[in-house]
């Protein structure tokens, strides 16, 4: 039996691979931009806010305020 190799189907657009490469590169660039924006617009300010809060945080003071307010039943 003689076997013949099948031919690959022709792409729909003549510029198909080039267009696909353009969109993949574009999507990669956009995703890097969004990740960078999120890091500097959301994550860094949040990290700074947490650091500022815990720099001056006194857990014993908060505990005493909650105890005086009557939140805890076991610590009177």
Swiss-Prot record:
GO BP annotation list: oxidative phosphorylation
Family membership: Belongs to the cytochrome c oxidase subunit 6c family.
Self-association and partners: Component of the cytochrome c oxidase (complex IV, CIV), a multisubunit enzyme composed of 14 subunits. The complex is composed of a catalytic core of 3 subunits MT-CO1, MT-CO2 and MT-CO3, encoded in the mitochondrial DNA, and 11 supernumerary subunits COX4I, COX5A, COX5B, COX6A, COX6B, COX6C, COX7A, COX7B, COX7C, COX8 and NDUFA4, which are encoded in the nuclear genome.
Gene Ontology cellular component terms for the protein in this record: mitochondrial inner membrane
Membrane topology: Single-pass membrane protein
Annotated organism of origin: Sus scrofa (Pig)
Membrane topology, Mitochondrial intermembrane segments: 56-76
Taxonomy of the source species: Eukaryota, Metazoa, Chordata, Craniata, Vertebrata
Name of the protein: Cytochrome c oxidase subunit 6C
Mitochondrial matrix side: 1-13
